[in-house]
Amino acid sequence: MSTFDQNSLLLLSSILVPLMVGAFLLFGAFLNKATRCWISALGFGYPLVVAVLLACFFEANPGAYNYELCLPTGLQSIGIYLHLGLNAVSMPLFLLAGIVGFSAGVYAIFSQVDRSHVYLALLLFMLSGLLGTFASVDIFFFYFFHEFALIPTFIMIGIWGGSNRRIVALQMTIYLTLGAMLSLLGLIALYISSGAQSFSLLELRSYLVANPLSQTVQNNVFGLLLFGFGILVSLFPFHSWAPKGYASAPTGAAMLHAGVLKKFGLYGLLQLGWPLLPLGAIHWFPWIIWLALANILIIGLITIAQRDVKLMLGYSSVMHMGYAFLGIATFSVVGAGGVLLLLLAHGLSVALLFMLSTCIYQRTLTLNMQHMGGLATQAPILGAFFIAATMASIGLPGFGNFWGEFTIFVALAESAPTRWVVLPAAIGIIISAIYGLRASANIFFGQPRGGFTERLQSGLIR
């Protein structure tokens, strides 16, 4: 079905290398620290190099995939193949996974954690699953790789998470299992209803163009996908797992999940839901709009109330996914482009912020912003990076987040049914500015407060 050219084999190897390195590290307690670091660096660095190379040679053709590879799995009788490829929707997110995965890996390599070989192995498994998710053309493996990436997240929170890690891990498991089951039911219903003979997205698309599903079937299937994927993206009111999960998760897991894995649901709606079920998408349009606005306005106000840095970042991440859902609700190419740009920019900025928040904790021994102040005098470089990442996250002009949100606003304004949404959605910009500027001011400027003063004077803050 496809040729085994150099680039398609590179795509396959980018998934297999972190998987194999992770498996080796899992049983690598006998390795010394230096060897473990170099082997881990290979596992995290190789996918980044491949992702950059594939992005450089990528040719964007509507509906077409680059670097296609199709391998038998033993399940050909039911239409399941390991079918890989990248199109204009998946390529940016595949590159995002490579960048954030490498950053999280480097940070993890230099972190002091117990059983570091297991910790690094789980991160590599997570990265392999993420890359496989975005590279899969077969919807069976699209779902399989996502679940494969989720499992290490639960384990890492349960072992290396914060003081309430077991409760948080249980809550995440319940929510994300529910979302995964609903999305699985939606995918199965899509396959059965279509009557197609393959799980290949390309064949499903071709078949449904020639034989569109009825309005009722599209409504039901899209509803399953919307709420299944929505739970995985923390769509209101199914959001409560995300902020606590990110606050409790070890830094590497928080970077990969908030920065990349969380984008799975939105990617699924862009790649599957809207193109294959257009009538169902239109039917659920009011729900998408109102729930997205709830993400922006209600979660935005909750974000303002936070005093813990990581909880603030977690709620902020949930809030900004509302803009991505609004972009999908435009059902336009401009809106889809804005969503992709926002997902890419948000993934980079939120991953950096979670890493920097851990750096702040290591220097202050607290995450309570009310117990900080004046840190810029002791850590000016940390302050500069945190403020820059915060400004990017809240959508300051010049950063990628701004252009993503701006493009979504343009798409909303161009369509009469969504034009009214521009004003309430714009209130979220003010909300973002309030919590972002306040956090930067409380942490890095002003006078040190409380016990923070003694730690500054005693030199505990590096």
Question: Which residues fall in each region the model found?
Answer:
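Helix-coil boundary and interhelical linker segments in multi-pass alpha-helical membrane proteins
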Residues: 2-5, 131-137, 270-284, 324-342, ...
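Structural signature of hydrophobic alpha-helical transmembrane segments
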Residues: 6-17, 86-97, 139-152, 218-231, ...
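Transmembrane helix-loop-helix hairpins at membrane boundaries of multipass inner-membrane proteins
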Residues: 1-10, 24-121, 197-198, 202-206
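Predominantly late transmembrane helices and immediately cytosolic-facing juxtamembrane segments
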Residues: 236, 350-356, 420-456
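C-terminal ends of transmembrane helices
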Residues: 22-32, 101-113, 155-164, 233-247, ...
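Juxtamembrane/interfacial segments at transmembrane-helix boundaries in multi-pass membrane proteins
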Residues: 59-81, 180-239, 269-287, 335, ...
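Central hydrophobic cores of alpha-helical transmembrane segments in multi-pass inner-membrane proteins
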Residues: 12-27, 41-54, 94-109, 126-127, ...
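Alpha-helical multi-pass transmembrane bundles of energy-transducing inner-membrane proteins
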Residues: 31-33, 118-213, 217, 302-369
